[in-house]
């Protein structure tokens, strides 16, 4: 019985013979169709072929009655993907290929091929209904992706363009409780990454912008939501293309890789270049070294119940060739993945961070590119939740936000490394020791978590920074390392007793455990250096923004000034009320008749600012009302009030109306004349006393500068408050924080704390920021 009769009896189309001839002679009937081998196979060929490791996961279907195979030469009308490719209409018995009507007309309509015998396939009603259902499903999927649009997620400066989780979910256009995975793509610029995503996920729609121009059309990181596969698709900027902020853009790629569940590395080259393996190897090393720890910290900090970094993402290397064979074609016994691992080992790169690495290649004889194999591989990996499970969009945003906050900031040009795609300098702190030049080994922005700078190497001494630290020798011998500093007095001494002891026996070194271990003038002669007797010296690193370590903490002079100032201020505050009352009464007694009495002036007549007890009230010489200093700072002659031709203080309103002559009656002029002489005498006395006070203030300022501790910022350099940025004036006094030495206003430095590290063992003025620091200052 012939093979044709056997097939007809089974209800199959005639001509469905094995197309592989791997274990048979090609005369056995076809039982299976392998979509990835693109052939019909008999029982023996199917078993022998798919016993190989690289072919083991191919999708095969068993042929049913009335089965019609796909057309062999084409991938469907207009080169569409296999999801909508054409079924064959005939089979050429001479060429032994299946042809659709279009391919038959194109290839067998002329020449000798016209005479080739053909067998017509009969399409059953069952097959027609199945194809109709497939087309309906395909149409539904296309319709689901019609409204998808991409949006800029992160710009080229590493700044996230989404404000919060709600904004991220709104732009993705997905449900807040939707569980999804993240698929991102990487590759060199111009290799068609955006084009690949458009055809793999969105049926060729230009969701991600593509351009035939030389300039890259993808700048930054763009994202879109695929409702069919329920994944967030991320398009990235190409490698080897950026010329500005290259280091920051490269670092941005690793942030995207860290939040991805599946990574596609797209390469359009006849052979796999070393750049691919170096990129993946360096990315793996940087991921394990810097990002795994941060992702775990984010999980704990945000209270997430999803492990973000159990294993890194899976990687698919999508390799498109034109003139060369695909990887592994000349070694059928070896899987392409094994050959890729060998390449990694030869280059000394070990991609341990990735959960798996897969190879998917396609050879494009004639455009367009076939993305069907890539799509099938992606769908298989997306269904696998063993290592990476889907998660809420909010979790994805939190992870990206945490990585962006942690690893941000400019990367200096001198720290750019060309031997690695992701050098440590992209992710570690950029601070350098001012003394030895060693770099900090901690991650970027570690100061926000209260972690101090650290270096791998020891520092060297620099006289400029005096980077020595004293530690108690006795405590060190007992296994403890306790830092000590020279200071004016012991913590057990009262402020005045400490000053007296300092004048007699000099500065002290006090250990919290051992007490006072050294006094500089304890004996009349023969006092030894503390380094030779009671302390050890260590050389430490000097980081930008920190002070030197053994600056002069002898603040005896400043303590004396603070004490005198405190007593003077106390007396002044106690006598402020009576003094002001007496002054106001005397002023009213000698004031002209048209002046409003001080007791009736509660606020400025122009700006309505209420006067405090110690505020000065000024009278306008023209109208006699009470004003603050800023509303009565102008001067002009007021001869109509008897002040003569000399300019005197007037308010802003009277100054603006200086061309209008006041109508003063003769009786008023006589009354004012009597009291005006007394007021002029009073002002002359007041101005004389003010000049004396100013003359005293100048040497007093010199005394303050001389008594100022070394770490205090000089008064003449302090122009505004270090915290609130208010400019200092006559009314706004400057105050030094005893911890950091910066200048502050009273509101920003009204707290009091002991600062032992600066020699202040009793509560003294500290700024708002220093007061928030935990532990001893």
From Swiss-Prot:
PROSITE patterns: ZF_FYVE. Signal peptide: none annotated. Zn(2+) 4 binds at residues 737, 740, 767, 770. Keywords: Endoplasmic reticulum, Golgi apparatus, Lipid droplet, Metal-binding, Mitochondrion, Repeat, Zinc, Zinc-finger. It is found in: Golgi apparatus; Golgi apparatus, Golgi stack; Endoplasmic reticulum; Preautophagosomal structure. A zinc finger (FYVE-type) spans 598-659, 715-775. Transmembrane segments: none annotated. Ubiquitous. Zn(2+) 1 binds at residues 604, 607, 628, 631. Its main location: Golgi. Residues 416-777 are annotated as: Required for localization in the lipid droplets. GO terms for molecular function: 1-phosphatidylinositol binding; phosphatidylinositol-3,4,5-trisphosphate binding; phosphatidylinositol-3,4-bisphosphate binding; phosphatidylinositol-3-phosphate binding; zinc ion binding. The keyword Amino-acid biosynthesis does not apply. GO terms for biological process: cellular response to starvation; lipid droplet formation; macroautophagy; positive regulation by host of viral genome replication. Interacts with RAB18 (in GTP-bound form). Interacts with BSCL2 in a RAB18-dependent manner. Interacts with ZW10. Plays a role in the formation of lipid droplets (LDs) which are storage organelles at the center of lipid and energy homeostasis. Regulates the morphology, size and distribution of LDs. Mediates the formation of endoplasmic reticulum-lipid droplets (ER-LD) contact sites by forming a complex with RAB18 and ZW10. Binds to phosphatidylinositol 3-phosphate (PtdIns3P) through FYVE-type zinc finger. This is Zinc finger FYVE domain-containing protein 1. The gene is Zfyve1.
